[in-house]
């Protein structure tokens, strides 16, 4: 439901995700060197490099090293991603939740079911009314599903913010500025994509409240009373799809917590430059199980959102291509760094990649 005065948000988000995904896909394709395939792969590897994969080799000249450093930022800037993600997600969550509470409650499941049965019994006019009511109910569910998906996103970015501060011990390594900007883009565009179908109407609602506040003044505005049961009950009445998505999300989150704890324990001294081969858990099967867990987490969000909004699908496609490319780069780095690195391990997905 697009409101007047708002741009077509969903097409813009789709375009942004496609623009971010296509270079990664192109770099992964076997494009001949003669037409720039090797150059494209090198550029994308440089832009996406961070940590252990970005540091110049000892053989590189000091001039080359300083030139590279101009286009990098400290890897500890990862925290900026999650600060931005928390801010963007919290603002959208509170705004859409408040809009849903004020305008789209209660859900009235039972009356909707009875009205549908009644419409079949009494004739076409009532049936038409039932269809309108059904569309209204469907719209309500769509907005409350968005609130549910944003709640999952909020949990994700808050956890990642905590882990960045208390679990990971970042080395003095750096990451490319393009990768840094991509991360900032991602943590703004991801919650926007989850909420894209509801943002225009929620914005229209708040825009309508501003003139009313200006005309009436605070003293003559009705008191705001929030009923906690009405605030939460619609979320509890959502369908099985949302709860299946939540279970997938929780499983992926628990697995990623375990993987991050293993990675964080590999460098006890924060200033240490030494890398070791991670073992145990799924590290024995794939090089980047924390990336695999990230895919599971966002697949859970996709399911919980209802999988009806195209930008969410493009978000997930970008995540698959981006994390797969990064995992292959990490896997290749491990092979070059450690002679005894297990070649039986996959990069990210067992038996696939």
Curated annotation (Swiss-Prot):
<keyword id="KW-0812">Transmembrane</keyword>
<feature type="transmembrane region" description="Helical">
    <location>
        <begin position="234"/>
        <end position="254"/>
    </location>
</feature>
<keyword id="KW-0472">Membrane</keyword>
<dbReference type="GO" id="GO:0003865">
    <property type="term" value="F:3-oxo-5-alpha-steroid 4-dehydrogenase activity"/>
</dbReference>
<dbReference type="Pfam" id="PF02544">
    <property type="entry name" value="Steroid_dh"/>
</dbReference>
<keyword id="KW-1133">Transmembrane helix</keyword>
<comment type="similarity">
    <text>Belongs to the steroid 5-alpha reductase family. Polyprenal reductase subfamily.</text>
</comment>
<comment type="function">
    <text>Plays a key role in early steps of protein N-linked glycosylation by being involved in the conversion of polyprenol into dolichol. Acts as a polyprenal reductase that mediates the reduction of polyprenal into dolichal in a NADP-dependent mechanism. Dolichols are required for the synthesis of dolichol-linked monosaccharides and the oligosaccharide precursor used for N-glycosylation.</text>
</comment>
<feature type="transmembrane region" description="Helical">
    <location>
        <begin position="175"/>
        <end position="195"/>
    </location>
</feature>
<feature type="transmembrane region" description="Helical">
    <location>
        <begin position="11"/>
        <end position="31"/>
    </location>
</feature>
<keyword id="KW-0560">Oxidoreductase</keyword>
<dbReference type="GO" id="GO:0005783">
    <property type="term" value="C:endoplasmic reticulum"/>
</dbReference>
<dbReference type="InterPro" id="IPR001104">
    <property type="entry name" value="3-oxo-5_a-steroid_4-DH_C"/>
</dbReference>
<dbReference type="GO" id="GO:0016095">
    <property type="term" value="P:polyprenol catabolic process"/>
</dbReference>
<keyword id="KW-0521">NADP</keyword>
<comment type="pathway">
    <text>Protein modification; protein glycosylation.</text>
</comment>
<dbReference type="GO" id="GO:0006488">
    <property type="term" value="P:dolichol-linked oligosaccharide biosynthetic process"/>
</dbReference>
<dbReference type="GO" id="GO:0005886">
    <property type="term" value="C:plasma membrane"/>
</dbReference>
<keyword id="KW-1003">Cell membrane</keyword>
<dbReference type="InterPro" id="IPR039698">
    <property type="entry name" value="Dfg10/SRD5A3"/>
</dbReference>
<dbReference type="GO" id="GO:0019408">
    <property type="term" value="P:dolichol biosynthetic process"/>
</dbReference>
<protein>
    <recommendedName>
        <fullName>Polyprenal reductase 2</fullName>
        <ecNumber>1.3.1.94</ecNumber>
    </recommendedName>
</protein>
<dbReference type="GO" id="GO:0160198">
    <property type="term" value="F:polyprenal reductase activity"/>
</dbReference>
<feature type="transmembrane region" description="Helical">
    <location>
        <begin position="78"/>
        <end position="98"/>
    </location>
</feature>
<feature type="transmembrane region" description="Helical">
    <location>
        <begin position="313"/>
        <end position="335"/>
    </location>
</feature>
<feature type="transmembrane region" description="Helical">
    <location>
        <begin position="291"/>
        <end position="308"/>
    </location>
</feature>
